[in-house]
Amino acid sequence: MILSFAACASDKSGSDTTAASDIKTDAATAPAADDSTTAPETTEPATSGTDAVSAAPSVRRGPTKTTPAADTTKPASGGNSGSTTVPSKPDDSKPSAVETNPKKIIVSAEKEWIFTEKPTDSCHASTVLPLDNGTVVAAWFAGSSESDDDVKILTSVRGTDGKWGEPIRVSADPNVAHWNPVLFQNDDGTITLYFKVGKDTEYWKTYYSVSTDGKNWAAPRELVPGDNSGGRGPVKNKPIRLKNGTILAPGSTELGGKYRCFVDISTDNGKTWNRTPEINSTFLGFFKTPMIQPTLWESKDGSVHMFTRTKVGKIYRSDSYDGGKTWCSAYPTNLPNNNSGIDLDTDDSGRIFLVYNPVGIPGIRTPLTLAVSLDDGKTFTKIKTFETGLAEYSYPAVVVKGDIIHITYTYERDYIAYWQIKIK
């Protein structure tokens, strides 16, 4: 299936012109800165295409849990892990992927578990970062349950032998919940781990820790000391570095239960940040569209784009033509969204690889699917489905490095799955 939509048209100065026409697709290829800046308005986007799901997910049970007799699991180092159980390992005998690779983009795909003995009762919101030395760093939040005080950030490193190391705890406050880690590597090789701290999303503050190897982390520090906006810097998905060296961090807040997106901009390698105004958008002509957790990419012409999670059944998109300083009003794509996290990345040729739950509102967070765009985000073709069970498979993170796509995601809030997908 190919999904298509039109971008907001804009000239190089950032001012909007006319609406783009409907994108035509070949049916034969279809498979089953500154706080004072203002965002320009956009014309109404075209809405051609379809968001129909080609097949309903099959029923499949998740890993069976056993009743804990005692707290015998080994907690991760670095602090109190909270209560633990003794679950069974994930069941790899169940089919979990549906291959729909029409253009033969995928050469091979291998699935792993970052851990099979749960260090905590619950886990969610992973992030992944492959390094030049062949190792892979992952992080996620874990504890009794989301928002509980014992929820902290756990990290693990996959060695060149293909084995994941013991999870390591990173904590800025032992008495407050931690959320949504994001990994990013600077040009000098330093790894930065961003994460949120706060009992509730309204009161988030952003902290960061640095490392040279993903195993040893410096004491966390607040990203923007004194900020009370509900969190600065990246909120779920990784920052991107533009061709000119500027770093854009996709951010959002949930103050008063209102979903609002913005971009944090750094021109000094992450030392200081300037927040853009909220990205404008309207739903049904007058309501502000509830949008959070954007994911970004830069096109070959230097324009920058975002997709966002929403509460209105569609992924929304916005575009910038001045390096992320101003953004056109966000508009709906034809990609469905069930108020669940998404992520994407580009390869060296400009192909965009998007991981998402292709389900509208209402809908549970399944299936979880990989789609590719060969035309800079105008159309997407599904090429792989990772999970199809009637459970939660969500919050993907994706990084393309060379000819390998690295993907992590939440598996039923019990495990973190990791995929290596070789592409051509």
For the regions a protein language model found, what residue spans apply to each?
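Asp-box/BNR beta-propeller blade signature and adjacent active/binding-site loops
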Residues: V86-K424
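Ser/Thr-centric signal marking residues that sit
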Residues: T17, T73, S266
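C-terminal motif of bacterial Sec signal peptides marking the signal peptidase cleavage site
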Residues: F5-A7
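Intrinsically disordered, low-complexity sequence elements enriched in Ser/Thr/Gly/Pro
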Residues: S10, D22, T38, S58-V59, ...
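Positively charged, low-complexity intrinsically disordered regions
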Residues: S13, T25, R61-G62, P90, ...
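Short, low-complexity, disordered segments immediately C-terminal to signal peptides
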Residues: A9-T37, T42, T50
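N-terminal low-complexity, Pro/Thr/Ser-rich intrinsically disordered segments
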Residues: T43-A109
